[in-house]
UniProtKB/Swiss-Prot annotation:
Catalyzed chemical reaction(s): dTMP + ATP = dTDP + ADP
Family the UniProt entry places it in: Belongs to the thymidylate kinase family.
A single Gene Ontology CC term: cytosol
Organism: Prochlorococcus marinus (strain SARG / CCMP1375 / SS120)
Record's protein name: Thymidylate kinase
SUPFAM superfamilies xrefs: P-loop containing nucleoside triphosphate hydrolases
An example Gene Ontology biological process: dUDP biosynthetic process
Binding site for ATP: G10, I11, D12, G13, C14, G15, K16, S17
HAMAP family, per the entry: Thymidylate_kinase
Function: Phosphorylation of dTMP to form dTDP in both de novo and salvage pathways of dTTP synthesis.
Claim: Kinase is one of the keywords in the record: yes
Length: 220
């Protein structure tokens, strides 16, 4: 039996890391996971040893003072994802385990496609290669206003992508809202107290797996 692949997406400051930490504690005790399944938490970029080096280049924490151009940036994200899928996500899912990733391919479409305004058809072509056909079972978009994102990050050290201006971030936010119209996306208003957001995610997951169970029973 294959495992489950969950992804949390959203603009910077939306609270993904906080909610993933909560899920890491809640899911194994929720009764949703098979007893033999393990839960793995990962992220993009940087979900592998190679990916950590790529993350430094992409986010501007590398010793080099040379920033990648937009097309180079896109290709580096694709390289990170190809390694991540091959080395982490695919093997874990094939083993029946559950994987939660902080960002996946939709972040590339939102940031590089909508934010950088790179060719979206090229991005999708690269993503098809990098993901090797892997798609999340469910993606949560933690949605906050751009103004709230900026406010939350006021006194934090920003990486290269986070340092982009408000106009760029608005394009990214609009991109996520557009992408989230696809199937298997759930939008959570994240401009609320953390525990309220956590409870909404829990309820959505419970409903999702109950519906899957009902469909299986109908077909059997």
């Amino acid at each position: 039996m294959k495992g489950i692949f969950l992804v949390l997406e959203g603009i910077d400051g939306c609270g993904k890391s906080t909610q993933i930490e909560h899920l890491a504690q809640w899911l194994p005790l929720s009764g949703l996971m098979p007893s033999a399944a393990k839960l793995f938490i990962t992220r993009e970029p940087g979900g592998t040893r190679l990916g950590k080096s790529l993350r430094q280049l992409l986010l501007g924490t590398s010793p080099t003072d040379e920033s990648p151009k937009p097309l180079t940036e896109l290709l580096l994200y694709a390289a990170d994802r190809a390694q991540h899928v091959s080395q982490v996500i695919q093997p874990k899912i094939n083993n029946g385990d559950w994987v939660i990733s902080d960002r996946f391919s939709s972040s590339t479409l939102a940031y590089q496609g909508f934010g950088r305004r790179l060719d979206k058809s090229l991005i999708k072509e690269l993503e098809n290669i990098a993901t090797q056909g892997i798609t999340p079972d469910l993606t949560f978009l933690l949605e906050i206003p751009v103004s709230e994102s900026i406010k939350r990050r006021e006194n934090t050290r920003k990486d290269r992508i986070e340092s982009e201006g408000e106009i760029f971030l608005k394009r990214v936010s609009d991109g996520f809202s557009y992408i989230a119209k696809n199937d298997n996306w759930l939008v959570i208003p994240a401009n609320q107290k953390k525990d309220i957001v956590s409870k909404q995610i829990e309820n959505k997951l419970i409903n999702y797996f109950q519906n899957i169970s009902s469909l299986k029973n109908e077909r059997s």
